[in-house]
Every structure is written in C-alpha cells, then in structure tokens.
C-alpha cells in the first residue's frame, strides 16, 4: 500500500495537477482526470497502468454523476431454424454468415430509426450492428469472439510494439465496383480523427502518433500495406482495427454530399457506397430499411442471406406481436411483461455482455445551482443510495442481471493478464468490487442530502422548505420507462418528485449528447475488453462525455 501511495503521489507531481475539489460552483474540476487518462494511455509500465486506471475510476465515481444499476446481458429472439448469426462480447451482431435454410430473406428488428449510418460518426449499438454488416475493417470477430482477418490478411508488429503493418487483401472492391485499397484506410482514419469531423469516438485515435493533425496511419504507394505508428504499445490494437469508427468510407461518396456542418450527409439516404456484405437498397424513415447482398464483397460466395429487411421500432409490444405473427424472424427487444413466460422458450436467448446500465447526471444542470462541488456530488450519491437495484432486476430485467456497484463491469480484464476488479493493492469502498452496497441505504442518503442543504421532517420526509423536483429523460422503449418508474417510486418514498419524459430514440441520443437534461437513462457496452475504454470516454473533449465533465 505504501508503494501504491508513493506511486500516485509521484504521478500527481509529474502531472502538476490542481486539486480536484471544486472548479467554480457545483461542477467537479476535471483537468486532473484528463491528465490521468493521458498518462494511462502513454505509460509502458503495465502494472502502473492498472493502478492508475483504478485511481481514475475512483475519481469518476466520486463525482456521483454515474449511478450504476446493473451489469448488462443481451436478450433477443430468433427462429429456431436460423443459424450462423452471432454476436461478439460487445453486442455487435453479425448476420452475413446466417443460414435460414431455403429462406434467403431475413426479417429483423434491432431498434428504431438509426441516428447515424456513417461509421465514423456512429456511437450507438444498433448503428454498430448496421455498420458491421454493411462495412468492414482491417479485422473483425468470428463466432467465438476471436479476432479474424477481414480487409487485411494479416499484420506484422515491430519489436517495440509501436508499429503495425497490415497487409491489405488483394482485389477488394467498394459496392460500386471501384477498388478499395490501403489509401482508403488512410483517408478514413485521418477523417475520423480530424476535429472538424466531430466524431464521438475521435479520441480512440489518440494513441496513434501525430494525432489529430498528422496521424501516422499511412498507406504504401501501391495501396497494398497500411502502417500505423503508435505513441505507446497498445494491447487492444486489433480491437480498434475491428471497430466501426476505423472502417473505411469512400472519399468520393463522402465528398459528393458531406458539408462542413454535416459530415455524415452522404449516408442519410439509401444508395450510398459501402464495402461490407450488404448495401442499403431502400430506407423508409422511421419505418423500415432493406439491405441487399453486395456482390462485390470479398467473401460474397459465403453470404447466404440475400436480403435483410429491418423493422424500425422500439415499441416492444408491436415488435413482439410481429414476431409472434410470423412477420419477423429476429427481434432484439421483448416486452417486460412477456419475459417470464419466455424463459423456457428455445427461441428466447440470454447472452452475457460486458457493459453497464446506469443513470447519468449532467453536472452542469441547473438542478445543482447554488451547491458546492462536494454538495452536488453528495446530492447525486444520495439519489443512488435510494435505488432498489434488485427490485429493478427482479421486476423489469428478469433475466439474471447482476447488481452494478461501479461503472466498470465485473469480469473486465486489466490489460496486464488479470481481472481489473481483483487488482492487487487496491480495494473498493464497499469492501467488494464497487462503490455502493447492493441494498438501498435510505438513512445514509438522507444524511448526504442534509449535508447538501436539504431538510427533512421527523418522519424522514423531505421538507417543503427545500423541495427536490426534476425531470428524468429516457427513450420510449417499455423497459426503460419501467425502470424510470421504479426510480420515481424510490425517490418518492422520501418526498422527491421526479417526472418522466420519454422521446424517440434518435432525438433522445442527441438531447443527451447535447446536455439538454438533468438526469437521464444511459448504458454502455464496452467496445473492447480493457478499462480504458470505459474511462477515456469521460475526458473533457470526448464525444461520449454525456455528463459534461470539464465543459
């Protein structure tokens, strides 16, 4: 422990960070966190890296802005005769090798209207699924969740781990038949990393030398190799090579329609050029999308399904009815009131995922006006302590989810050959693996609210002289609304008034991203199995920083 303390003190001295108690008003100072993440991404000492990631997790959770509810699992239904489809541990579903017997059309539902189809701009799970089936990267995942070559046939890495050279597959073509080469990767990676593109995931390129203005991701003159130079060794480099933000897009197609204000304009209607197993043939907004087999896909001979017909809806009841009526073959959502009756159904599937369902606070919200940073954090932590997570799992989730006591999920690797939650020399406040006990603690919640200036009467009900009232933002899926109602009930038990606002998926994503909320539902499924993925998203400049830290 003494060694750990000395290490952290040394890091703080090197960073020259200011104390992270209060910026101005109720917001937490965030420079220290940003610098900590930068150090984590640049260090070559992997044991030190693990300890620094634990320190960053402590800083993140101490804000109270992230309220973990449960660790995810995935629930879907598929006809028994449908085989060959698969999902990786990060919730991306692959249908290009699906086999449906004599059927060459697959009718399915993943979500409602997608927010963005440009792979560089997408940050939603449903968008990643669409991208994985219509675009491709250097690498992909096979049915076992292992890395598999895709547009690259292999790679070589330098002895110091800083240079990756990918061999590009011969004969690759875009869906319009034009050649796809390493130069398309160079253009696309530099575009996604560029500040003017405003990609939510642009920070993922930060580990590459020259980011963001002179990215060292260079194609050979003949377009047959693609060389990436890193700032520090990266254990998850192949995960990045398989991630949608790193998929190539055709420069001519992009530049024919994109504008400075809308870099993704080229992919707002059907007919754009893609590179994967399928291409978008038609799109009736807010209703349906039809993808057809891409004859120019490099592995087209192994693609059996000719058409993917998507129903665009997050109305669980309507989706389930369509499945029951035989109008859909695969659905990614099920009404909560049907789950108990489906648990023994062979068409009902529950798959573990590496992610967390949580509630997010906007630290810049007016609901924290007049409070110090410490009081605002205590306010948020108090609300977390009021939540009966097991009740939510038992009555809404119903599929064996585990209570989440931290944002980082159980089972996540530490990047150094171990499990992050079990790292030597570190302990969690709850004595187990997180920051909250599994049971609600109303008494402690009230004490924290009192420390933030709120008053309670003798029966532990909030005083009318210091009322608390706020709006909770969610999308229209029945499960999310049901969870919101559970929270509403828990908060009302001590006199807190919470109203619920539910809006369509694409609108919800943008409202949350823009910070137009005080408290909202959220969820994150890891993009790869390393804690940095769920820590770097909260840096000041990250496009996924929904809490608005440092802004």
Where are these regions (language model features)?
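Detector for C-terminal structural segments
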Residues: 23-106, 284, 386-422, 478-488, ...
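Append "and occasionally in soluble cytosolic enzymes with long acidic Gly/Pro-rich linkers
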Residues: 29, 55, 292-293, 374-489
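Aromatic- and charge-enriched surface segment that lines or borders ligand/interaction sites
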Residues: 48, 153-201, 221, 227, ...
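N-terminal lobe/hinge region of extracytoplasmic solute-binding protein
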Residues: 68-70, 76-77, 90, 109-159, ...
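A structural "hinge/loop" feature
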Residues: 77-94, 112-128, 151, 237-248, ...
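Surface-exposed binding/hinge segments that line
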Residues: 81, 156, 186, 201-255
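Gly/Pro-rich hinge or "lid" segments in bacterial periplasmic/extracellular proteins
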Residues: 116, 122-125, 132, 140-146, ...
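Extracellular/periplasmic solute-recognition and catalytic clefts
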Residues: 192, 281-292, 309-367, 390, ...
């Amino acid at each position: 422990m003494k060694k750990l303390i000395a290490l952290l003190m040394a890091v703080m001295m090197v960073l020259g960070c200011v104390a992270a108690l209060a910026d101005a008003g109720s917001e937490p100072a965030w420079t220290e966190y940003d610098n900590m993440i930068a150090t984590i991404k640049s260090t070559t000492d992997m044991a030190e890296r693990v300890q620094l990631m634990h320190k960053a997790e402590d800083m993140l959770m101490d804000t109270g802005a992230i309220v973990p509810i449960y660790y995810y699992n995935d629930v879907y239904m598929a006809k028994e005769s449908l085989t060959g489809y698969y999902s990786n541990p990060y919730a991306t579903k692959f249908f290009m090798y699906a086999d449906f017997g004599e059927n060459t059309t697959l009718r399915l539902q993943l979500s409602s209207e997608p927010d963005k189809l440009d792979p560089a701009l997408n940050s939603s799970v449903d968008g990643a699924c669409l991208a994985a089936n219509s675009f491709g990267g250097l690498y992909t995942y096979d049915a076992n969740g292992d890395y598999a070559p895709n547009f690259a046939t292999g790679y070589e890495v330098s002895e110091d781990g800083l240079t990756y050279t990918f061999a590009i597959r011969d004969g690759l073509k875009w869906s319009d038949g034009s050649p796809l080469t390493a130069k398309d990767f160079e253009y696309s990676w530099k575009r996604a990393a560029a500040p003017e593109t405003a990609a939510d995931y642009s920070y993922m390129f930060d580990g590459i030398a020259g980011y963001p203005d002179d990215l060292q991701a260079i194609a050979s003159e003949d377009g047959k190799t693609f060389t990436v130079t890193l700032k520090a060794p990266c254990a998850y480099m192949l995960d990045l090579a398989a991630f949608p933000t790193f998929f190539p897009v055709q420069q001519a197609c992009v530049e024919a329609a994109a504008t400075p204000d809308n870099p993704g304009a080229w992919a707002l209607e059907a007919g754009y050029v893609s590179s994967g197993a399928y291409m978008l043939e038609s799109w009736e907004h807010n209703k349906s999308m039809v993808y057809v087999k891409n004859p120019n896909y490099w592995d087209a001979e192994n693609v059996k399904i000719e058409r993917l017909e998507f129903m665009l809806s997050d109305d669980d009841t309507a989706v389930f009815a369509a499945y029951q009526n035989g109008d859909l073959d695969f659905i990614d959502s099920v009404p909560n009131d049907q789950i108990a009756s489906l648990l023994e159904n062979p068409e009902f599937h529950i798959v573990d995922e590496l992610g967390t369902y949580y509630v997010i606070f906007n630290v810049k919200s007016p609901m924290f006006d007049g409070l110090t940073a410490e009081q605002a954090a205590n306010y948020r932590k108090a609300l977390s302590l009021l939540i009966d997570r097991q009740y939510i799992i038992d009555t809404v989730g119903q599929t064996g989810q585990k209570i989440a006591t931290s944002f980082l999920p159980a089972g996540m690797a530490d990047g150094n050959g171990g499990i992050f939650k079990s790292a030597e020399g570190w302990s969690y406040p709850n004595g187990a693996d997180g920051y909250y006990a599994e049971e609600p603690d109303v008494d402690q919640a009230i004490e924290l609210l009192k420390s933030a200036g709120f008053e309670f009467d003798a029966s532990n009900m909030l005083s009318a002289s210091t009322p608390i009232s706020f709006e909770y933002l969610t999308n229209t899926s029945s499960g999310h609304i049901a969870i919101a109602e559970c929270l509403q009930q828990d908060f009302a038990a001590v006199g807190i008034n919470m109203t619920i606002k539910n809006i369509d998926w694409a609108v919800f994503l943008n409202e949350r991203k823009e910070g137009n909320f005080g408290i909202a539902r959220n969820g994150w499924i890891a993009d790869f199995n390393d804690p940095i993925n769920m820590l770097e998203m909260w840096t000041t400049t990250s496009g996924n920083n929904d809490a608005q830290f440092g802004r």
